[in-house]
Amino acid sequence: MRLLQRSLAILLFFTTAAGAQDVIRARSTLVLVPTLVETKKGEPVFALKPEDFVITDNGVIQPARLEEDTDLEPLALAVVIQTGREAFAQTNNLRGLNTMIDSLIGDVDRSVAVVAFDSQPQLIQDFTGKALDVSDALKSLQAGDGGAAILDAVKYATHLLSQQPKEYRRAVLLISETRDHGSHAAIQEVVQQVGETNTVVYSVAFSPSKTELKDSFRGNNATGPSANLLSPILMTIQAFRRNTSAAIAHLTGGEYVRFDSQFGFDQQIGNLTNHVHNRYILSFQPPSPAPGLHGIRVQLPAHSNLRVIARQSYWASAPPD
């Protein structure tokens, strides 16, 4: 599929080549859908063809295409790290973070920023192409207060990314706990901003406490007519409340993993990197999509025994006047 150095390039799929157009703002919307297909044992599946996939946009079937080549375009990455609440105790587990960042980005032009957050986000290192500056910023992190304003931090990072050159693709590497504590930004506001700026969020979360883990599964098995009739935005809000870091990753086509030790961190990053460069990049072009959040579903009707992990939604903005 792709070499390791192309891993993050595949994740950062939302902008068009060389920034030629804003794919979500344009009337002719190109939606790219990174898709991982696995067996029940977790082994990646290759050799599928476009006709094997069925993509729906708000329930309407769309013609699917398979993007064979992904150019190595420049990457803008915001590394967003929680330092509030109990997060700073996880610092020793993140010793391999700088190496992981370099491995994911690979041999392409890059611009990396470091943002720390507790009850509010703080820019530790502005966008730079120097790996040493990023390393020094990561080493300088200090324990924060009792907040964990994940939504505020993602909104802040997305704003910073929106100011980068248009030819740069955009991504957030979010390292945090699973639940938001203390954000002022509304979920809908963050969802719209992430969608409109074509930013993919890649979440690596501390394992939650037993109480949080129990709470996070409440409501997941809802039955009855209301379970499948909720609008995409209402379903998204519910997901964000259960597990903020997972919801925002799934929303944007990124991936969510959890860890509770340095070994777990290294192992999960290795698994995630393997997933990234083994993904299919599907695309479809809906005619004149209605403004707002659209739900995406990817299926393999002839291969019901396979597991499909794909982007779940995109945001279509109103056309300019």
Where are the regions a protein language model picked out?
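Scaffold/interface architecture of coatomer-like assemblies
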Residues: G19-D321
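N-terminal signal peptide c-region/cleavage motif recognized by signal peptidases
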Residues: T15-A17
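Exposed boundary/loop context
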Residues: L12-F13, D52
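Bacterial N-terminal signal peptides that target proteins for export
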Residues: M1-L8
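Hydrophobic transmembrane signal anchors and adjacent membrane-proximal interface regions, especially
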Residues: I10-L12, L32
